[in-house]
Amino acid sequence: MSLPLPEGRKRRVWPWVVGGLTVLLTLGLLTGVSFGHYSVKRSFPQTSGVIELAGLSAPVDVLRDERGVPTLYADTMDDLLFAQGYVHAQDRFYEMDVRRHITAGRLSEMFGKDQVPTDSFLRTMGWRKVAEEELGLLDEKSLRILAAYSQGVNAYLQDRSPADISLEYSVIGLINPDYEIQPWGPADSVSWLKALAWDLRGNMSDEIYRTIMSAAVGVDRTETLYPPYPFDRNRPIVDGGNVVDGEFVQDPPGLQVTAAAYGPAAIPAAAMPALTDVLQASAGINDWLGEPAR
């Protein structure tokens, strides 16, 4: 047999109940926020201190500017490429992993059967197959560069859980618990060049849209949707130079071009300043310049 609590006792009990629930909810919220913060930051790159890595023949310095952009200094090309692979994996391995699945037509392995039609198209393009065939045609120096870079990427992946590599893998684990990260290889690097070539094959539709918009609302407003590259913020490391006899030269000798040879190019050259106002300037760098004799 239970008896009702006196009215005064009820008033004393409710504040304790409400206070207890408030404390529990607050603790739960703080725990959730702390766990979320930890889950996000656990895969962030280490940007200070010293990292001991097997595979380097000498120390490599990695300096980051105020925007986090790294600049690497090494004594040998092998060490430089090794460190570049490591730093790339630190900063963006998930993106790299998605891209190699794109070029191989294996997106469904990451994201499920909905990606099968996309994989079918990508395998028809054959980017991965072409990349693997090209590896057999590369010289020893190129293969060594690709191998050193791959070793650096894999040095970062070694002994790290998917969640330590990138937050996105925790999400993939919920929809595809069987997914496993594979080591990086030279073909993964070369195959993305095929995708870049596809992406840079032409930007006709963008140029049409930009031209129409420029005529309708003006160049300044159009550039809010198609902004030019911010050279004032991200200055090129090398502002000139050329490759001469297989080596980079900062100030190469100029081509001897006669006035007669230049004459036919004068008309389109004069029109270029007007065209650059309406044509997109930041789609990519895929330009070639040949001397008249070629």
Feature locations, PLM:
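Substrate-recognition/specificity elements adjacent to catalytic centers across diverse enzyme folds
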Residues: 30-294
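Acidic/proline-rich low-complexity IDRs
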Residues: 2-4, 20-24, 274, 288
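Juxtamembrane low-complexity tails/linkers enriched in Ser/Thr-Pro and polybasic
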Residues: 1-11, 271
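N-terminal Sec-pathway targeting helices
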Residues: 7-27
